[in-house]
Regions:
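Class I SAM-dependent methyltransferase SAM/SAH-binding core
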Residues: 37-41, 45-92, 117
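Conserved catalytic/acceptor-binding region of the Class I
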Residues: 116-117, 123, 127-193, 209-213
Length: 250
């Protein structure tokens, strides 16, 4: 399945709504001000674009998945903000050098295969006195653990593959964006009425899990259930756990 189509399967907006607080946190840490030109790279359904636009910034939201941009447009309209939604590749941004005061990405840039190229593009379009602010799940956190477990049962990745959660390590970000980077760790709380119900919801809604289920069948479901039971902090039959992410501001 083509990656841009994969993200359009299921109901990603329902998943994105659960991590909306991370977009708000990222926008706050980016110190966006009215009138600034802001680019949200791999904007998804607009979790960071819309909060930035609410601050009276001039926001461009870019993503390679048309289905996600359709949802983002609806979200922006419902929120009564103006965002320029553009289909495009994080590894080949369709903008001139030094076009933006802020370049942000909330869990989107991390999925671009070539980390160096993605970082170079973000730096290229950011103004010399601007800032790049990104959020990524940490590899040692509970979402990072999900990526590890599913990766362990999946076919070997192509040569040179870089795990998305490398963006959640300080050393890797410094290698990509330079030494002048500030880091903060935050958490998103994930909740469900039950482990089984949450697993069903995610496997039906989250594009990467849908694709993995098609490829791995019951092994994916069994592995995901085991993971959820291991990370669950609730003792009342429900599901509750905290996913750690790293905010990097350069």
């Amino acid at each position: 399945m083509d990656p841009s189509e994969m993200w359009g399967t299921g109901d990603y907006k329902a998943v994105a709504d659960r991590i909306a607080s991370a977009g708000e946190t990222l926008v706050e840490r980016a110190q966006i001000e009215p009138g600034m030109d802001v680019l949200d790279v791999a904007c998804g359904t607009g979790n960071a674009s819309v909060p930035a636009a609410k601050l009276a910034a001039r926001v461009t939201g870019l993503d390679f998945a048309p289905a996600l941009l359709t949802i983002a447009r609806e979200y922006g309209a419902d929120s009564m903000v103006e965002v320029d939604w553009i289909e495009g590749d994080a590894q080949a941004l369709p903008f001139e050098e030094a076009s933006f005061d802020r370049v942000i990405s909330c869990f989107g840039h991390m999925f671009a295969p070539d980390h160096e190229r993605t970082a170079d593009e973000m730096r290229r379009v950011c103004r010399p006195d601007g800032r790049i602010a990104i959020a990524c799940w940490t590899p040692e956190g509970k979402i990072g653990e999900m990526f590890r477990r599913i990766g362990a049962i999946s076919p070997p990745p192509p040569e040179g593959f870089q795990p998305p959660t490398l963006w959640g390590t300080e050393d890797h970000v410094r290698e990509l964006l330079g030494d002048d980077v500030q880091f903060e760790r935050h958490h998103v709380e994930w909740r469900g009425d039950s482990v089984e119900g949450y697993a069903e919801f995610m496997e039906d809604s989250f594009g990467p899990l849908i694709a993995a289920r098609e490829q791995l069948g019951d092994l994916l479901h069994e592995t995901y259930l085991e993971y959820l039971n291991d990370v669950n902090e609730a003792d009342d039959g429900a599901l509750r756990f905290r996913g750690e992410y790293l905010v990097s501001v350069a």
